[in-house]
């Protein structure tokens, strides 16, 4: 019996590759995030920095079953939309297909006749791009995670200061 090591024949890309989609004479650049890549904010951020007009997430959520995993996974796409001010189109083979606008609002969701996301089927959507964000980079897209690091540093300093004050009182 042979075991294939994790990541056996996968080679990471060296640059962001965007797909072009021409609609009505306009060309839209699409940043593709495969499955759980939407969990990693830096991947979406680099696509936006490279000129992506929207993100497309193709995902296999079938292994979650009909639990909350598909909705929790979709929440990451909401974060990516807000962080980068780009719409996100999601296509899941086992739940949660739809689109999220650049403000993080779920604008359309593929549901069956019973109102559930867990079924086989398909649909089409019209995605709106808000002009005020079109081709502009959000603060997060331009500057990244420095605010998170700064907040973590301030929280750590506050904790150490508080512990020091407790030690002085005792």
Question: What does each of the following model-derived ranges do?
Answer:
Residues 1-170:
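Enzyme catalytic cores with a strong preference for nitrogen-chemistry domains
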């Amino acid at each position: 019996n042979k075991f294939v090591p994790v990541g056996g024949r996968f080679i990471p890309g060296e640059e962001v590759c965007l797909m072009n989609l021409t609609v009505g004479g306009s060309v839209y650049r699409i940043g593709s995030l495969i499955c759980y890549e939407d969990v990693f904010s830096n991947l979406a951020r680099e696509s936006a920095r490279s000129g992506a007009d929207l993100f497309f997430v193709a995902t296999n959520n079938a292994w979650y079953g009909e639990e909350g995993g598909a909705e929790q996974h979709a929440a990451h796409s909401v974060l990516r939309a807000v962080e980068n001010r780009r719409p996100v189109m999601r296509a899941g083979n086992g739940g949660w297909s739809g689109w999220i606008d650049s403000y993080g609002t779920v604008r359309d969701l593929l549901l069956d006749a019973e109102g559930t996301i867990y079924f086989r089927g398909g649909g089409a959507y019209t995605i709106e791009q808000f002009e005020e964000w079109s081709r502009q980079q959000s603060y997060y897209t331009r500057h990244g995670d420095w605010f998170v690091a700064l907040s973590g540093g301030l929280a750590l300093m506050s904790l150490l200061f508080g512990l020091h004050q407790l030690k002085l009182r005792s």
